[in-house]
Amino acid sequence: MKISVIISTYNCGALIVKALCSLVSNQTPACELEVLVIDDGSIDNTRQIIKKFQAKVSFTLKYFYKKNGNWGSVINYVKENRLANGDWITVLDSDDTLKPNTLNKLANLVEKADYDLVVFDYTKCWKKIKLKIHTYPTWWKNMTRELQKQTPFCIPLGKFLKRNLFYKLPKLKEKVSFQDALYTASSLKLAKKVRHVNQSGGNYHFKRAGNSMSIPWNIKRFSAELDICKDLIRLNAQEIALVHLLRQQFRVQLKEKQIQLAVTRDFNFSGFSWYTRCFLWMVYQTMLKRYFYLQTTKQ
């Protein structure tokens, strides 16, 4: 089985070493590893670091340099040039790492059943705090219903797509942030069979300087968040759009600009775990309901 790992990087030469080392420790006879480093216009020493690694590792490590266009442009670049040749494809940010044995666990799973998408839990790291995030309830394994497949934890880390699913994904927007949420939501919508693994597949470094979560709340960030919410609603994932409104600064600007988001159905949290369902229902009723309105369709 061949696995393609896409590493999106921009001026992260000091951090990408850990990401690459985590792949070295994941090598297994069950998997042929192909690593594609897509440099989104860095001006640091990323190229030199990758060149040194290419001489040391036993797996395929390719480096591509492109003009800066943000995260969505990296995925578009890989798809347009058909760079990922693995049976399974995943995306790893340059400041994140895979947990040991993740690829071996994946290989054992997909050998036994025909899945389109395998979703691991992950560990959220912030300063000295490490917290395991359960992407789905611990007892959920196989998801087929559309609303059941939704998850508010929509980073690409630990999500492995079959190659044909990856290349079916719609083109992402470029030169804007937060396209990873749309990437994940589109993957979940198109996947027929989703398998959840109740095991952390990697470490996600939250609010690292320079990543999208550390961007200040200016008009550009507000517009990007608003567009993502509208796109998620179009994907019938309005419950995930609602999660974006948990950010206070986003709500403040929506209120100032008197913006409401149109939805075409009532909110349904039945696909979430009971504790997430209770929390989202409560905050929707008490805080967030005012930011949405039900748009009736004409007969």
UniProtKB/Swiss-Prot annotation:
Disulfide bonds: none annotated. The lineage of its organism: Bacteria, Bacillati, Mycoplasmatota, Mycoplasmoidales, Mycoplasmoidaceae. Belongs to the glycosyltransferase 2 family. The keyword Transferase applies. InterPro entries: Glyco_trans_2-like (IPR001173), Glycosyltransf_2 (IPR050834), Nucleotide-diphossugar_trans (IPR029044). Pfam families: Glycos_transf_2. Signal peptide: none annotated. This is Uncharacterized glycosyltransferase MG060 homolog.
